[in-house]
From Swiss-Prot:
A GO term from the CC aspect: nucleus
Active site: C185, H212, D229
Biased composition (Low complexity): 325-334
Protein's name according to its UniProt entry: Peptide-N(4)-(N-acetyl-beta-glucosaminyl)asparagine amidase
Cofactors, names only: Zn(2+)
PANTHER family: PEPTIDE N-GLYCANASE PNGASE -RELATED (PTHR12143), PEPTIDE-N(4)-(N-ACETYL-BETA-GLUCOSAMINYL)ASPARAGINE AMIDASE (PTHR12143:SF19)
Top-level taxonomy: Eukaryota, Fungi, Dikarya, Ascomycota, Saccharomycotina
Native species: Kluyveromyces lactis (strain ATCC 8585 / CBS 2359 / DSM 70799 / NBRC 1267 / NRRL Y-1140 / WM37)
Length: 353
């Protein structure tokens, strides 16, 4: 190594040390300060959307951090089939070791949609066995049995053929949903997020203010967060909502055990709804404050690594033009949403019209 190369290496190393020190100072310096805490408390008292974000944080950020649940998932799924299909795909595509997780996630999407979970427009009548004659009656509170499984509300239907009443509890307990194996996008995303975590994958829950949810997974191969929608068996197609579905959206937020982030820029390219539920400055503060809270017990190496990952994502989200998109979204693919009945999709504005 020449003297110049040694000097350059030394300067580079020193620069990285200073940058690391600056990052750690930013994260540690004001974390939990009385000023930030006071601002946060004031914000959630005065702003309804801020309270909603805080509620989602409490509900979602640690929901899937449960080793006992992981064991239940792995006992239920057909692991032989899953890994056999992954190995075949890896071999057929001559994939490298670092690509293995991507192929695993793609197979989990396929298996979950095609072999494991089912979509429920309406439940089947317990007497005649079909949903053909069911008509909507209304909603009801969960009974004592249903309430055991975090049931928010119950849809009630009456069969015009038999007269029987059928209840459809909207469970939020993912372990209960592993038994029922049916639902709509909320139930699907809930269980699939747990499945991703059970396989040791770095996954997070994505919430859209206009009533849709999906997942993201951090790909070691692609070195970025990848969009996943188990309802559509969709891998890395973040613009299917605004483009293929023609869905109107305002806010899209990510929740995991180490971050709360506004990822709207990844998903909203057209049909933008007004973002007036909270100021951009206050939304950024909310996300940063909650993320710092999640990371308060992390060591310096973890804080620095995550901060670098965050910065990489921030830069990518600034590239909102389609020409700069690195995803594989099928902009000329199927128009409208695949999952759900035609009437339901039209009602939600997700049929591509």
């Amino acid at each position: 190594m020449t003297d110049f190369q040694e000097t350059l290496s030394s300067v580079s190393k020193r620069f990285l040390e200073l940058y690391r020190s600056k990052i750690l100072s930013q994260w540690r310096g004001t974390n939990g300060s009385s000023e930030e805490e006071k601002r946060f408390n004031s914000l959630i008292q005065q702003n309804g959307f801020a309270r909603q974000i805080f509620g989602l944080y409490k509900s979602l950020c640690f929901r899937y951090e449960n080793d006992a649940w992981y064991s239940v998932v792995l006992d239920i799924l057909d692991l032989d089939l899953i890994y056999s299909n992954v190995d075949k795909a890896v071999q057929d595509n001559n994939a490298s070791d670092i690509e293995y997780q991507d192929y695993l996630v793609k197979e989990l999407l396929r298996y979950f949609k095609r072999d494991f979970f089912s979509w429920c427009n309406k439940p089947n009548c317990s007497k005649c066995g079909t949903d053909e004659h069911l008509e909507w009656v209304g909603t009801d509170r969960a009974n004592s049995e249903e309430a055991k499984y975090q049931c928010g509300n119950v849809e009630v239907y009456r069969c015009t053929l038999t007269g029987d009443i059928t209840r459809f509890p909207r469970y939020n307990d993912p372990i209960k949903l592993l038994q029922t194996r049916t639902g709509r996008c909320g139930e699907w995303c809930n269980v699939f997020t747990l499945i991703l975590k059970s396989f040791g994958l770095n996954a997070r829950y994505i919430w859209n203010k206009e009533d849709h949810v999906w997942c993201e997974y951090y790909s070691p191969n692609l070195k970025r967060w990848v969009h996943l929608d188990c309802c559509e068996q969709s891998f890395d197609e973040p613009h299917i909502y605004s483009k293929n579905w023609n869905k109107k959206m305002s806010y899209v937020l990510a929740f995991s055990n180490d971050i709360v982030a506004d990822v709207s820029g990844r998903y909203i390219l057209q049909n933008n709804l007004p973002r007036n539920a909270i100021s951009e400055n206050e939304l950024n503060f909310m996300c940063t404050y909650l993320t710092k809270t999640l990371r308060k017990d992390f060591n310096d190496d973890q804080i620095y690594a995550l901060a670098c990952r965050d910065e990489q994502e921030r830069l990518s989200l600034e590239k909102t033009k389609p020409s700069k998109d690195t995803s594989t979204t099928t902009l000329t693919g199927t128009k409208g949403r695949e999952s759900g009945s035609t009437a339901w999709k039209q009602q939600r504005g997700e049929d591509g019209s």
